[in-house]
Amino acid sequence: MARTLEAFLNDERRRVVHLKDVLPPNASDVDWIGYVSREAGDWIVVTRDRRVLTRSAERVALQSARLRLLAMSAGLLKLQHHEQMARLIQQWPRVEAAMALVAPPAGYRLPPRWNGQLEQLAV
């Protein structure tokens, strides 16, 4: 997912980072959240892990890191990878617009439908 986003989004205003490129493969959610919070920039974290918002340690880490999170919906995760990426890229302008309107910590869920609305999440 990160490689596709990188090809689509990298420009002078944006940078896409795959966590596997900067952290060990066994890094925990709390580890990567801490890493991102220490890096400069206005991050939008894209994740397939819906549980990051339901486990208390990860939720506390997200709140203290003051990140913006985009979670893939369960319905979206059932689609083939290329369909997931097509929807993510198609919805990206909406994602950026929505994230610009909320103070971190904040989160949205990306729907599986082409015309689906982003669902704001409690972070």
Features from the language model and the residues they span:
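Ser/Thr/Gly-rich flexible loops in soluble cytosolic domains mediating phosphotransfer, phosphorylation
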Residues: 65-99
